[in-house]
Amino acid sequence: MSAHQQGTELDLSWISKIQVNKPAVLRRAEQIQARRPVKKEWQAAWLLKAVTCIDLTTLSGDDTASNIQRLCYKAKYPIREDLLKALNMHDKGITTAAVCVYPARVCDAVRALKAAGCDIPVASVATGFPAAQTHLKTRLEEIRLAVEDGATEIDVVINRTLVLTGQWKALYDEIRQFRKACGEAHLKTILATGELGSLTNVYKASMIAMMAGSDFIKTSTGKETVNATFPVAIVMLRAIRDFFWKTGNKVGFKPAGGIRSAKDSLVWLSLIKEELGDEWMKPELFRIGASTLLADIERQIYHHVTGRYAAYHDLPMS
């Protein structure tokens, strides 16, 4: 990942008069979803690009060392080698961007990747994920422990109460403390947009998170009733663009929650390309948080190469 985004001093004038035009956002969301996705060879290339941007995730109560090991193996070998050879991509080092786990499973992931001779980053959720309803000291200590165990990316989740009650300085101060606790680890800030009440709040929370030094802003925990949606994404991407114009600092974007199909990933890539440009279409600035997306991408690539859809036994690790 690129160098840390240092953030700025808190400037509430950047958000004080913001009002999001919801009808315009909804029209833009409908437009992007109505586009025809890329086809044939271009589609295979875009799907492989999507693979390299996935944070391959497991966040289940029954996670164990063994399924973390399988997750890490799949992260290193996301697409069957014969399929990559057919596309002349077998020597390109294609892996997922990272694996993402609970703090208690960080050591398992670090060990598994080390045993595989792989330097894929380990991301850990933190700060009382998914609700953030724990004491601040506890949330900060959780970050420090995850980093100590080997996580190099930390996906924190904000206290939604601070957004819903307009406590923007308190939100900024908390995220600044998260930034400090991360040390050299990169900070991804989950806004849990499905619980923020309005698109205007989504924009304001995005801007505060970036001012406070977030390297990425992320839509959702994946545990909310409403997760990554295109209207929310458009608002967050416009905030990223505005922040870049104001500061020259590039902040990454990570949608997460409910992204399951290869077609979904193509639409997300198209949205990034149109809203932020080609420079953001790389894992340093774009991630997709997903558990099952990779399996469908591999099935679509299998179909592209062989002309038929895979049976269950054809892709046993998917």
Swiss-Prot record:
Organism for this UniProt entry: Bos taurus
Reaction catalysis annotation: 2-deoxy-D-ribose 5-phosphate = D-glyceraldehyde 3-phosphate + acetaldehyde
UniProt entry keywords in alphabetical sequence: Cytoplasm, Lyase, Nucleus, Schiff base
Localisation per UniProt entry: Cytoplasm; Cytoplasmic granule; Nucleus
Gene from which the chain derives: DERA
GO CC, any one term: cytoplasm
Residues the record marks as active site: 155 (proton donor/acceptor), 218 (schiff-base intermediate with acetaldehyde), 254 (proton donor/acceptor)
First-listed, main subcellular location of the protein, grouped into a coarse class: cytoplasm
Disulphide-bonded residues: none
Protein name stated in the entry: Deoxyribose-phosphate aldolase
